[in-house]
Amino acid sequence: MLTRTLLSALLSLMATTSLMAQLTIKDLTDGKYRPESENVEAMADGESFSRLEEGKRIVRCSFKDGKTLETLFDADNVRGRVKIKEVCDYIISPKEDNILIETEHQQIYRRSGKGKWYIYSIKNKTLAPLSDGDAQEQPLWSPDGYMVAFVRDGDLFLVKLLFNNSESQITKDGELNKVINGKPDWVYEEEFIFTRAFCFNADATMLCWMRFDESEVPAYSFPLYKGLETERKEFLTYPGTFEYKYPMAGERNSIVTVHSFDIKSRVTRKLSLPVETDGYVPRIMPTSYPEKIVCLTQNRHQDQLSVYVCNPRSTECRLVLTDDVKPYVSETAYEDFRIVSDGFIYKSERSGTAQLYHCSINGGAPRALTSGEWPVVEFYGYNAKEGNIYYSAKDGSPLREAVFVCDSKGKVKKLSQREGVNEAVFSTNCRYFLNKWSNIDTPPVFTLCDGSNGKVLTTLEDNSELRNRLSSIRLGSKEFFTFTTTEGVTLNGWMVKPADFNAGRKYPVVMFQYSGPGAQQVVDSWSAGNMGGCLYEEYLAEEGFICVCVDGRGTGGRGAEFEKQTYQHLGYLEARDQVETALWLARQPYVDSKRIGIWGWSYGGYCTLMSMSEGRPVFAAGVAVAPVTSYRYYDTIYTERFMRTPNENPDGYADNAISRATRLSGRLLICQGTADDNVHYRNVAEYAEALIQADKDFYQIDFTNRNHSISGGNTRAFLFRQITNWFKQM
């Protein structure tokens, strides 16, 4: 009887398991398991936010309960003859009476794009084109809401609403691959992470902008083919060429100057901003004072950030702060730089961990607003009257982040309620915030919360549909772990095991990593893994693999000392740590030590190649997607931040994937887009030649007309099928 009962239970379990859904690569790449998101913009009243619904409606909602208060724009209810079908982006005017609405968006580079923009009157429900000319880039309302400035073809334009939307051209020297006004060049956009390089002053009497003279920057070009998705019929017979300015390590950068335009007198001036030879201007921004804008500068070594207060009318610039941080200033310093009513707030690692500081607009010693062993991740808001500052920081572990408020006396209160990774968008008065929470097992949950105590007021989105979809799949277990290398370094990792894991079996392992400076893959967040939720890793687990990710030396979340020890030798320590991970895994009783593979994308591809040629032959196979192979071929700003120039650091540059080609061990697959504007095809071309001359076998797949993301049409599904099959052949 007992035997019959056990047999019945076993058959029932087998039947249930066989009925459960399976993950497929096509479903993963087509977005079947992509979580819903909430993108909101806080409105001026401090009580409401706006958001875009279904790509055609802009609504105003309450921060208290999330309910819709009014519809600001509906594409189906526009009056007049001008109509649009979709909303790609929108910008509400300062007085919240008009909206700039974008349609027909066209991507330019990773962060930039252009489109057809319209001015929408909320009161009249009418649309009017922002310009009758070609597509516009980066439109910006003036503080009084009566003007809009934008960029087109490298020049700045100004539209005045009070003069029947009259358009005037502010600059006239913009020229492809020579001069850009009001928007960054390629390397500034990519590495300083911004797309608009102009601003109005506080009373809207002056327009200020950055001018990029890239005429002496070396050009780079690559071929464009007809292709299929999207088809370029103009290249049916002969391929075309895309050429742009790309400064590689040690080469010339654009000469950047800052200018002002007096809107009434139409006088243009050049600001007397001191910039070191070949130095940088990562940001300009307005203050609440009409006679003051702020300009940030950096030296070429990027170990000094200077803050200047500039008068756009007199052109005088006064130094108010210099932040010296060795060996380099992290890019988050200017990402989180914020002008507030009584000065500015910035993030610095001067104490060894990233913390927030306040400085008067008139200068003086900066005052620390936060402190502690765990780094601040992001700055959200500041209440000057109460002295409260709102931010996220690591929460007792590099893996987790929480939202905090710190008062004027330094007392810190955690606002977020759940352990994992929390991010926030605060109302303009910081009374409320939208909290995005997830952990490695749970898709994002978006809640509206009280800004004083973090109490959840309502849930906007909990991704219940996705959770239900995933509940029908037999997923493997995900677990965090730490281990210590033979060099005495403790590293963090996560591991995904098959759902039917048997400790008595030996499993092949696929290691995924990125490993770049300041980056993190090992986080208690749904963002973990290559496709979020470790879902691609779960798919591999279904196929019988254990999947592992370890953050080695140089990665983020553990303070400046841990992060910056790879300085001047990118790839050396990172590769050692990935090899150490493989050696540790090989000692585990459930791992097949002869079948350990590694892969990564971009920097992760570089680290894959460096690890497979580190000298200890531990990897049976590897896949490098869009890899850098020598940092001589990568851009100035990123590379020199971590490596200085090739002339200053010849030994650091000399140790690269190409020079290590003779030591390659394991079966290698390289995947590369032919139209990658970021990591150029040249990287794999030069590496392939080195492998051929070293008589090393390898396989390579080129993706026609694909950029660094290698996507479009069936491309992603094909790519991940090749990666999967490659590891199946270990």
Question: What do these predicted ranges mean?
Answer:
Residues E36-E41, E47-S48, L52-R60, E70-T71, ...:
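Non-catalytic accessory segments flanking enzyme active sites
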Residues E36-V40, I84-I91, K183-A202, R283-I284, ...:
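Signature of short aromatic-glycine-proline-rich micro-motifs recurring in repeat-based ectodomains
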Residues S50-K56, S62, I92-K95, I99-R111, ...:
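Beta-strand C-termini and the immediately following turn/loop, strongest in propeller blades
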Residues F63-G66, S121-K125, L161-N164, D262-R266, ...:
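Short loop/turn segments that connect beta-strands within beta-propeller blades
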Residues K67-I99, E104-Q106, D132-E137, D324-P327:
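Blade-loop segments of beta-propeller domains
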Residues L69, E104-Y109, G113-K116, I170-F198, ...:
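Predominantly five- to eight-bladed beta-propeller fold
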Residues R111-F157, F163-A197:
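Asp-box/WD-like beta-propeller blade repeats and closely related beta-sheet repeat scaffolds
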Residues P290, E423-M730:
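Serine-hydrolase catalytic core recognition
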